[in-house]
Amino acid sequence: MQRSTLLLPFLFGLFMVTTKVDAQYAWDFGIHLGGANYLGEMGGKDQPRRDFVWDMKMQQTRLSVGGFARRRINRLLSVNAGLMYLRVQGADELTDYGPRSGRNLNFRNDMFELYLRSEFTIFQDNDLGGRGRYKTDFRLFGYAGIAALYHNPKGQLNREGEFYDLRPLRTELVDYSNLTLAIPAGIGFHFTKKRRHRFGWDIGWRTTFTDYIDDVSTTYKDPSQMSALGAQLSNQNNYVAGIEGLPHPNNYGYGVNQVSGQPENVRGDPTHNDSYLTMTFTYSYVLRGQSNYYRQRYNWIRGTKRVGRKSRAKF
């Protein structure tokens, strides 16, 4: 899929934010708080890589927190922009799949995500419970958009001691960027109490444009072209070599195919980019628009009677 196509939700959101609408509008400002997990080469369960949540280790879920601003465009569409901090991590030591256990790599990544997404209403009830009091409303929505992501993977030697920045160590002799794009998509809901306090929940999947969230992607490279520390972090099979049930150490580390002359030992899976999942609770405070249209149409809900313009009688 071309990047120009993936930018369409972002451009559409900007267009809608700047479009004047003849209806009630509302801003709300709030926070996210929840967890994040990732899908990539690292860790996993007892099989080779599988898509989506089936290959995630729930015990590796870590903090996700952020803030956002949302504008309601109309009853079916809102635009949400926010900044989130989240941590994802993984370790081959935690998997029951032999080839990954033998690789024995690990990482953690503290990431910052700046996103813009469009939220599409699936279902809405403006008078939850149907009592005519209009004190609580409910909205179920789906969303999609675009995000800019800053990430910085770090790793340990055998999951002990200091964490080292992996990108400058070039463990696969690749100069990848700290910045990338992601495509967020998900579903959520919120309750609005007394038109001011909005409590919600959402879950979202992010597909990224990089395979280096975990610093693992292709094959083992020549350690002589790395620093001593980079070479140690690139291949950590030596810490588990000889453990019964794991593949032979010859399956790990730099080796050249005698026919093609290319590295032959697989370190990662370059056919799939890394992804991550967030699940957060949200709270926001609603600011209502005060246009003449809004006052005339909705004052009856607040108990304010509409009063027509009076004129003096003429005799």
What are these regions, as identified by a protein language model?
Residues 25, 59-63, 110-114, 138, ...:
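Residues that define the transmembrane beta-barrel architecture of outer-membrane proteins
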Residues 31-35, 67-71, 116-120, 144-148, ...:
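Residues on the lipid-exposed face of transmembrane beta-strands in outer-membrane beta-barrel proteins
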Residues 36-40, 82, 86-90, 123, ...:
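Structural signature of outer-membrane beta-barrel domains
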Residues 36-64, 68:
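Surface-exposed strand-loop-strand hairpins of Gram-negative outer-membrane beta-barrel proteins
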Residues 39, 76-79, 125-126, 195-199, ...:
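Repeated loop/turn-to-beta-strand initiation elements of outer-membrane beta-barrel proteins
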Residues 50-55, 99-107, 129-130, 168-175, ...:
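Extracellular loop and loop/strand-boundary signature of outer-membrane beta-barrel proteins
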Residues 75-77, 83-159:
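Gram-negative (and chloroplast) outer-membrane scaffold detector with strong preference
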Residues 194-315:
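Predominantly the C-terminal beta-signal and adjacent terminal strand-loop region
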